[in-house]
Curated annotation (Swiss-Prot):
PANTHER family from the UniProt entry: NEPHROCYSTIN-3, TETRATRICOPEPTIDE REPEAT PROTEIN (AFU_ORTHOLOGUE AFUA_6G03870)
One GO term of the biological process aspect: negative regulation of canonical Wnt signaling pathway
SUBUNIT field: Interacts with NPHP1 and INVS/NPHP2. Interacts (when myristoylated) with UNC119 and UNC119B; interaction is required for localization to cilium. Interacts with CEP164. Component of a complex containing at least ANKS6, INVS, NEK8 and NPHP3. ANKS6 may organize complex assembly by linking INVS and NPHP3 to NEK8 and INVS may target the complex to the proximal ciliary axoneme.
Species: Mus musculus
Listed name of the protein: Nephrocystin-3
Compartment(s) where it occurs, according to its Swiss-Prot or TrEMBL record: Cell projection, Cilium
Keyword list, A-Z: Cell projection, Cilium, Coiled coil, Disease variant, Lipoprotein, Myristate, Repeat, TPR repeat, Wnt signaling pathway
Gene: Nphp3
Coiled coil regions, renumbered to chain: 107-203
An example Gene Ontology CC term for this record: cilium
Domain of life: Eukaryota
C-alpha cells in the first residue's frame, strides 16, 4: 500500500511532507475521527474521478491518498472494493450519527424551550416575591415607626405624669411648710403670752381657740385621730439637760412660764412622751461606756493565798455564767492576769479595770502593794458606780494584815455610795466560791443587764409570765445587737478631741436644716479618712444640744458586706425608729421591697405630727451594695420638715447623686495638721528640732498627708516614738509614707515588732486575719476558744496595742477594724493569697460548726456561719446550715429576713422549695417529748408560719401556725397566754388573706385569754384590741373600730409602756441608776430634786413601788431642807398623790392633794398654773369618789383661774363652765346648771363657730337637761341640732368621728326614769 510519507492536513487539505526523508517506515495511525475521515475520503475520490482513464497522474507531492497509493503500488480491484465497502460503512455510520445528533438537538431544543418557560415562570414568581417582600418590609418599617412613636409618647406621658406628681407634691409640701410656719408663729405668740402672763400682765384674746389636751381637732379625711390621757406626775426641769420636751399651749395648766409648771412629765401627753423617748435615744453619749459595754466583763484580782478559790470559780462556775449570758445574747468574760510583782503590765491592767463591768477581788490575809493600787482604783476610785464583789476568806488564828483591814474599812465606810459587796467566809472554800457565784449572778441580772425586778414581779404576781421576751415588742422584730452597734459607732466617732476647721462645715449643715423645702439630700463628700463620720457625729451632738425638739435618725455604715451595710436592715431600723413615735406599735413587714415602699409613708406620717425637724443621716452610704436601687426614696421630694444628709467617698459616689448639693471636706490645712502632730508630741514630752519641723512642714504640703485619719495616725506614731526614745528614726519612717494605707502598714509593722515574743507576733497576725475574713468581727471569748494556749495577758496586750494605734475597736462586744483603711491594710499585708483567706474562713467555720453540733445556737453562729459558707461557695453546707431551724429562727426573730432569703437564693431554692424543706426538717422534732421540747417545737412552727407569711405564702403559713396552736394547747393549757399568741399570729395571716370572719373570731378568742391571764388593763389585751380595731377598719366598720381603739388607748394610758417594750426603757433604767448615784450624798435641794426625777422615771417604767420610795425620800428631804410649806414640797406631795391615784388608793391621794393645794394656795398667786393643776386633779378625784359637794368649789375656782388667765370669753373658760354645769346636773340642780351651759354655748359659738364639735357636745348636754326638766320639745330641737353637727363632722372625717372625753377621762352617764336610751351629758376638760 505504500508508505504514509505524506498526509493531508486536517484543516487545510495540504499535504504534510515526511520530515524523515524518503526512507520507508511504518505508516502512522490515523486518529479515528469521523469528520476528518469523511472529508479525507471525499477529497480522495474527487481527485481520483477527475483523473479518469487517460488523464495524467499528479506529481508526487500533489496527489491524494489514492493516487499516491496507486502510483506506488498500481491499481488493485480488491483494494478498491475494500475502500468502497469502507466508504459505505462509514457513510452509514455517519448517517446514523447525524440522525442521532439531530434527534439530540431536537430534544435539547425542546428542553431549552421548557427551561425558558420555567425560567420565565420563576422570574415572574421572583418578581412577585420581591414585591411582596418590599410590601412586608414597608409594613414592618411602618410598624416599628409606630412603635417608636408610641414609646416616645409613653415616655413623654410618664415624664409629664412624674412632673405633675412632683409639682403637686412640691405644692402640697409648700403649703404644709406654710402651715408649719403659721403653727410655729402661733406657738411663738403663745410663748410670748405665757411670758407676759408670768410677769403678771393679763392679756385677753377672746378669739383664741381652746387647746386643752382633749380638744377636738377637725382633721382631713382619713386622718387617724390619736389620744393620750394626762399623767398626774410632775418634776422640775433639771432633766432638761437630757430631755427637752416641747411645751405647746394647752390651756391654763401651761399658761405661764414653763419654769413654773410641774416639769416635763407633768400632765404628760402622747407627743411629749414621744419626744421624751426620742431624747432618751439621742442621749446615749451621756452614759458611760461601761454601762453600754455589750460583754459582761469580769476582772478577777487574786493573791497567792486565794489563787485556789479563783481557779475553782473559773472551773466550776464561770461556764454556768457564760451559758446564762449566752442565752440572753451577751458575752461573758472572766479576765485574769498572772501576779505582776514587777508591775510590767500596769498599763494593761488599768485598761482592763476601766473596761470591766464587774471587778471581783479574792482576798485573804495579805494584799501585796502592787495589787493595792488596782483595788483602790476598782473599788474606791469608781466614778461610774460600777459594781464590785470582794470575797474575804477568814481563818481562825490568822490575823488580817493592816493593809487588808484598812482597805476593807474604806470600802465599808463608803456605804451606799459604792456598789461593792463584801462576802466574808470562813468555811469550806467551795462553799465560799458558791457564794461568789450567787452574788455575781445577782449583780449581772440586776445591775449590769437591768433585770432587777423581774423575779420579784413574777413572785408578786403569783404566776410565771411565760410570754417570750420578743413578744413584748408585739409583731415588731427588733435586733438589739444592731441598735447597740449603732450606739457604739456614734460614741466612737464623736469621741475625738480634735475637730479643727469644722466650724465652716457646721454652718453649712445648719443652713440645710433651715433652708425652705423642698430640698434634695445634702451630699457630704471627701477622700478616705477625711473626717466625714467625725463631722457628722459632732454636728449631731450640737443639734441635740441646741435644738432638742429636732428628731435625728442616724446610721453609720461599717465596712462593705457587714451587717451594718445591708440596705434592708438599714431601712428596717430607720422605720422602727419612726414607729417608736407612734402609740400603737403595729406589725412591720420584713419583705425588702415592701419595706422600701413603706418607709417614705412612715416618714411622711411622722413629719405631719412632729413639731420639730426630722433629720436622717446615713454615713458612708456608698458602702451599701446597690445603693441606688435600694435608696430610691432619696430622689423623691421629702416632706417639708425632713432633711437628709449622706456621706460618700469622692471615688465611689454614684453618678446620679453628684448633682445634689455637696459639702466637700477639704484636707486639713498644713498649719492645722502640724499643730495636731506637735500637740500630741508635747503631751508625751517630745520636742521636735527645727530641722525636723521643717521636714514635717514640707511633708504636709500634699493633700494626701493632710487627711484627718493620716494626721491622727502620724501623731500617734510620734507619741509612741517619744515613749520609746526613737523619735528621729520613727519620723524618718513616717515621712516615707505618702498615704493612709502605707502609714497603716508602718503602724502594723511597729506594733508587731513591739510584741514580746514570736508567738505573740504570730497570734497578732492570726487575730487580725480572722477579724478581716469574718462577717462582723470576732469576740475575745471566741479568740480564747480558738487559741486555748493563749493567755488573757497576751490577748489583752495585743488588743490594747492595736486599739491604741487605731487599728481595732470594740463594737457590740466584737473586735473590728476601726477604719476601712485598716481593714484594707491587713488584707494587702497578710491576705493577698486567696488560699490564705479560705483557710482562715475554714477555721471560723470549724469553730461555729462545732457550736452547732453542741446545740449552741447563738446570734453569733447565726450571723457568721451561713455568711462564711456563702463566701466559700459551699452551697451544700450552706443548705444544711439553713435547714437547722434554730439558726433560721435566730435570724428571723432578729429581723434578718432579707439575709435569710438571700442565702436561700444563693442555694438556688425558690419560695415553695423553702417551705417544703422546712416542713421536712420539722418532722424530726415531732417525736420530742417533755413540755420544754414541745414548747420549743411550737416556737419553731410559729417562726416558720411567720416566715412563710412574710414570703406571701399565706395558704402554707396557716399550717405551721395551726400546728403551733395545737401543740401549745396540748402542752400548756387552752387558756395559756402563749395560746393567745398563736391565735394572734394565725389571725394576722387570715387578715392578710382577706378572711376577716376567721380573723375576728381568733382575735376575740386571744383577747379573752389575755384578759383572763393578765387582766383587762394589760398591754397584751390592748394589743388584741388594736388588732380588732384594725380589722374592723379594713371592713369599713368605723364605729366598732373606734370603740376598740378607744379601749386600747385607755389601757395604754393607764399602764404606759411595760418595761422592756421599748428599747428606750433600757436607757431609762440606766439613767435612773446614774441619778441614784447622785443622790447618795448630803441633804441638798438638788438631791431632793434628783430623787423626785427618779420617782418620775420609775413611774414611767410602771414600777410604782420603787417610784413611791423615791418620791417619799424626795418629800422628806425637801421638808428637812426647805421646810414643810415650800412649793417644792407641794410638788412632791402632788406627785405622790398622782401615784396613789394610779394605785387606786383614793383616800391617801385625796389627803396628799389637799396638803399640796393648801401649800400652793398660800405660796402661789391665785392664777398660778401649778395651783390650777392641783385644783383640777383634786376636783377630778372628788368627782370620781362621789364627793360632789367638795368638788363644786374646786370647779368654781377653776373657772375663776381660767377667767383670770385667758379672759371671760376664752374657750377654756367655757370648758370649765361645762364641767361645773355637769356637776350641778349630777346634783339635780338644773336651775344652776342651765345658765352655765348657756354661757358656755355662747362662748363656744363666738370663738369656735356654730358647727364646732364642742358646740355639739354642749347642745347635747342642754338637751339632756331639758329632757330631765320635762321640756321634751326643746330637748328634741337641741338634740337634732347636735346630731347635725356630729353628722357634718363624720362626713368630714370620712366616717370616723372621734370620741371626745374630758381631760380627766370621765364621761358622765345619767340614767333617768323617762327612757332607757336617753342621750347622756358629757363633761369636758
Amino acid at each position: 500500500m505504500g508508505t504514509a510519507s505524506s498526509l493531508v492536513s486536517p484543516t487545510g487539505g495540504e499535504v504534510i511532507e515526511d520530515t524523515y526523508g524518503a526512507g520507508g517506515g511504518e505508516a502512522c495511525e490515523i486518529p479515528v475521527e469521523v469528520k476528518p475521515k469523511a472529508r479525507l475520503l471525499r477529497s480522495s475520490f474527487r481527485r481520483g474521478a477527475g483523473a479518469g482513464p487517460g488523464s495524467l497522474p499528479r506529481a508526487a507531492g500533489g496527489g491524494g491518498l489514492l493516487g499516491a497509493s496507486f502510483k506506488s503500488t498500481g491499481s488493485s480491484v480488491p483494494e478498491l472494493e475494500y475502500a468502497a465497502a469502507e466508504f459505505e460503512r462509514l457513510k452509514k455510520e455517519y448517517e446514523i450519527f447525524r440522525v442521532s445528533k439531530n434527534q439530540e438537538l431536537l430534544s435539547m431544543g425542546r428542553r431549552e424551550a421548557k427551561l425558558d418557560t420555567e425560567n420565565k415562570r420563576l422570574r415572574a414568581e421572583l418578581q412577585a416575591l420581591q414585591k411582596t417582600y418590599q410590601k412586608i418590609l414597608r409594613e414592618k418599617e411602618g410598624a416599628l415607626e409606630a412603635k417608636y412613636q408610641a414609646m416616645e409618647r409613653a415616655v413623654t406621658f410618664e415624664h409629664d405624669r412624674d412632673r405633675v406628681k412632683r409639682q403637686f407634691k412640691i405644692f402640697r409640701e409648700t403649703k404644709e411648710n406654710e402651715i408649719q410656719d403659721l403653727l410655729r408663729a402661733k406657738r411663738e405668740l403663745e410663748s410670748k403670752l405665757q411670758r407676759l402672763q408670768a410677769q403678771g400682765i393679763q392679756v385677753f384674746d377672746p378669739g383664741e381657740s381652746d387647746s386643752d389636751d382633749n380638744c377636738t381637732d377637725v382633721t382631713a379625711a382619713g386622718t387617724q385621730c390619736e389620744y393620750w390621757a394626762s399623767r398626774a406626775l410632775g418634776s422640775e426641769h433639771s432633766i432638761g439637760s437630757m430631755i427637752q420636751l416641747p411645751q405647746p399651749f394647752r390651756g391654763p395648766e401651761f399658761a405661764h412660764s414653763s419654769i413654773d409648771v410641774e416639769g416635763p412629765f407633768a400632765n404628760i401627753n402622747r407627743d411629749d412622751w414621744d419626744a421624751a423617748v426620742a431624747g432618751l435615744l439621742q442621749a446615749t453619749p451621756l452614759f458611760s461606756h461601761s454601762l453600754w459595754s455589750h460583754p459582761v466583763r469580769c476582772y478577777l484580782i487574786y493573791t497567792d493565798e486565794t489563787q485556789p478559790e479563783m481557779e475553782l470559780f473559773l472551773k466550776d462556775h464561770s461556764p454556768k455564767l457564760k451559758r446564762m449570758c449566752e442565752t440572753m445574747g451577751y458575752f461573758f468574760l472572766a479576765v485574769y492576769f498572772p501576779l505582776d510583782v514587777e508591775n510590767q503590765y500596769l498599763t494593761v491592767r488599768k485598761w482592763e479595770i476601766e473596761k470591766s463591768s464587774l471587778v471581783i477581788l479574792f482576798l485573804h490575809s495579805t494584799l501585796p502593794s502592787f495589787l493595792l493600787e488596782d483595788c483602790e482604783e476598782a473599788f474606791l476610785q469608781n466614778p461610774e458606780g460600777k459594781p464590785g464583789l470582794i470575797y474575804h476568806r477568814l481563818e481562825d488564828g490568822k490575823v488580817t494584815c493592816d493593809s487588808v483591814q484598812q482597805f476593807l474599812d474604806q470600802v465599808s465606810n463608803l456605804g451606799k455610795t459604792t456598789k461593792a459587796k463584801i462576802i466574808e467566809h470562813s468555811g469550806d472554800p467551795a462553799e465560799g466560791v458558791c457564794k461568789i457565784y450567787v452574788g455575781v449572778e445577782k449583780i449581772i441580772k440586776q445591775d449590769i443587764l437591768g433585770l432587777e425586778n423581774t423575779d420579784v414581779e413574777e413572785k408578786d404576781g403569783g404566776r410565771e409570765d411565760s410570754t417570750p421576751e420578743e413578744d413584748d415588742f408585739g409583731d415588731v422584730l427588733w435586733d438589739i445587737h444592731d441598735e447597740q452597734e449603732q450606739m457604739e459607732a456614734f460614741q466612737q466617732t464623736s469621741s475625738s478631741a480634735h475637730e479643727l476647721g469644722f466650724e465652716k462645715y457646721y454652718q453649712r449643715l445648719d443652713d440645710l436644716v433651715v433652708a425652705p423645702a423642698p430640698i434634695p439630700p445634702l451630699l457630704v463628700s471627701g477622700g478616705p479618712g477625711s473626717g466625714k463620720s467625725l463631722l457628722l457625729s459632732k454636728w449631731i451632738q450640737l443639734q441635740q444640744k441646741h435644738f432638742p425638739n429636732t428628731l435625728i435618725l442616724s446610721h453609720f455604715v461599717g465596712r462593705p458586706m457587714s451587717t451594718s451595710s445591708e440596705s434592708s436592715l438599714i431601712i428596717k431600723r430607720l422605720t422602727l425608729k419612726l414607729m417608736q413615735h407612734f402609740w400603737a406599735v403595729s406589725a412591720l413587714t420584713l419583705d425588702p421591697a415592701k419595706l422600701l415602699e413603706e418607709f417614705p409613708h412612715w416618714l411622711e406620717k411622722l413629719s405631719a405630727r412632729h413639731q420639730g425637724s426630722i433629720i436622717i443621716i446615713i454615713d458612708s452610704i456608698d458602702q451599701v451594695q446597690q445603693v441606688e436601687k435600694h435608696m430610691k426614696w432619696l430622689i423623691d421630694p421629702l416632706p417639708v420638715n425632713v432633711r437628709v444628709i449622706v456621706s460618700v467617698n469622692v471615688e465611689t459616689c454614684p453618678t446620679a447623686w453628684r448633682l445634689w448639693p455637696t459639702l466637700h471636706l477639704d484636707p486639713l490645712s498644713p498649719k492645722d495638721a502640724i499643730s495636731i502632730i506637735t500637740a500630741e508630741c508635747y503631751s508625751m514630752d517630745v520636742r521636735l528640732s527645727r530641722e525636723q519641723e521643717k521636714m514635717l512642714e514640707q511633708h504636709c504640703r500634699p493633700a494626701t498627708t493632710r487627711h484627718a485619719l493620716y494626721v491622727t495616725l502620724f501623731s500617734k506614731m510620734m507619741a509612741c516614738a517619744g515613749r520609746g526614745g526613737n523619735v528621729a528614726e520613727t519620723l524618718h519612717q513616717c515621712l516615707q509614707c505618702q498615704d493612709t494605707v502605707s502609714l497603716y502598714k508602718l503602724v502594723l509593722h511597729h506594733v508587731r515588732e513591739s510584741m514580746p515574743s514570736d508567738r505573740d507576733k504570730e497570734w497578732m497576725t492570726q487575730i487580725l486575719c480572722l477579724i478581716n475574713v469574718s462577717h462582723n468581727g470576732v469576740s475575745e471569748s471566741e479568740l480564747m476558744e480558738l487559741y486555748p494556749e493563749m493567755s488573757w495577758l497576751s490577748l489583752t496586750s495585743i488588743v490594747h496595742s492595736l486599739h491604741k494605734m487605731h487599728l481595732l475597736t470594740y463594737s457590740c462586744g466584737l473586735l473590728r477594724f476601726q477604719h476601712l483603711q485598716a481593714w484594707e491594710t491587713v488584707r494587702l499585708q497578710y491576705l493577698e493569697d486567696p488560699a490564705l483567706v479560705s483557710s482562715y474562713r475554714e477555721k471560723l467555720i470549724s469553730y461555729f460548726a462545732s457550736q452547732l453540733s453542741q446545740d449552741r445556737v447563738t446570734w453569733r453562729s447565726a450571723d457568721e456561719l451561713p455568711w462564711l459558707f456563702q463566701q466559700q461557695g459551699s452551697k451544700q453546707k450552706l443548705h444544711s446550715c439553713l435547714l437547722n431551724l434554730l439558726v433560721a429562727q435566730n435570724l428571723y426573730k432578729r429581723g434578718h429576713f432579707a439575709e435569710l432569703l438571700s442565702y436561700w437564693q444563693f442555694v438556688g431554692k425558690d419560695k415553695g422549695a423553702m417551705a417544703t424543706e422546712y416542713f421536712e426538717s420539722l418532722k424530726q422534732y415531732e417525736n420530742s417529748e417533755g413540755e420544754e421540747n414541745m414548747l420549743c417545737l411550737a416556737d419553731l412552727y410559729e417562726t416558720l408560719g411567720r416566715f412563710l407569711k412574710d414570703l406571701g405564702l399565706l395558704s402554707q403559713a396557716v399550717v405551721p401556725l395551726q400546728r403551733s396552736l395545737e401543740i401549745r394547747e396540748t402542752a400548756l393549757d387552752p387558756d395559756h397566754p402563749r395560746v393567745a399568741q398563736s391565735l394572734h399570729q394565725l389571725a394576722g395571716v387570715y387578715v392578710q388573706w382577706k378572711k376577716f370572719g376567721d380573723a375576728e373570731q381568733l382575735y376575740k378568742q386571744a383577747l379573752e385569754i389575755s384578759e383572763n391571764a393578765y387582766g383587762a388593763d394589760h398591754p397584751h389585751a390592748a394589743r388584741e384590741l388594736e388588732a380588732l380595731a384594725t380589722l374592723y377598719h379594713k371592713q369599713n366598720k368605723y364605729e366598732q373600730a373606734e370603740h376598740f381603739r378607744k379601749k386600747s388607748v385607755i389601757i395604754r394610758q393607764q399602764a404606759t409602756r411595760r418595761k422592756g417594750s421599748l428599747y428606750g426603757f433600757a436607757l431609762l433604767r440606766r439613767r435612773a441608776l446614774q441619778l441614784e448615784e447622785l443622790t447618795l450624798g448630803k441633804d441638798k435641794p438638788e438631791n431632793a430634786r434628783t430623787l423626785n426625777e427618779l420617782g418620775v422615771l420609775y413611774f414611767l417604767q410602771n414600777n410604782l413601788e420603787t417610784a413611791e420610795q423615791f418620791l417619799k425620800r424626795s418629800l422628806e428631804m425637801r421638808e428637812r431642807v426647805l421646810g414643810p410649806d415650800h412649793p417644792d414640797c407641794a410638788q412632791s406631795l402632788n406627785n405622790l398623790a398622782a401615784l396613789c391615784n394610779e394605785k387606786k388608793q383614793y383616800e391617801k391621794a385625796e389627803e396628799l392633794y389637799e396638803r399640796a393645794l393648801d401649800i400652793r394656795r398660800r405660796a402661789l398667786a391665785p392664777d398660778h398654773p401649778s395651783l390650777a393643776y392641783t385644783v383640777k386633779h383634786l376636783a377630778i378625784l372628788y368627782k370620781k369618789t362621789g364627793k360632789v359637794d367638795k368638788a363644786v368649789p374646786l370647779y368654781e375656782l377653776a373657772v375663776e383661774i381660767r377667767q383670770k388667765s385667758f379672759g371671760p370669753k376664752h374657750p377654756s373658760v367655757a370648758t370649765a363652765l361645762v364641767n361645773l354645769a355637769v356637776l350641778h346636773s349630777q346634783m339635780k340642780k338644773h336651775s344652776e346648771a342651765l345658765p352655765l351651759y348657756e354661757r358656755a354655748l355662747k362662748i363656744y359659738e363666738d370663738s369656735l363657730g356654730r358647727m364646732h364639735p364642742r358646740v355639739g357636745e354642749t347642745l347635747k348636754n342642754l338637751a339632756v337637761l331639758s329632757y330631765e326638766e320635762g321640756n321634751f320639745e326643746k330637748a328634741a330641737e337641741l338634740y337634732k341640732r347636735a346630731m347635725e353637727i356630729k353628722e357634718a363632722e363624720t362626713s368630714l372625717l370620712g366616717g370616723k368621728a372621734p370620741s371626745r372625753q374630758s381631760s380627766s377621762g370621765d364621761t358622765f352617764l345619767f340614767k333617768t326614769t323617762h327612757s332607757p336610751n336617753v342621750f347622756l351629758p358629757q363633761g369636758q376638760s
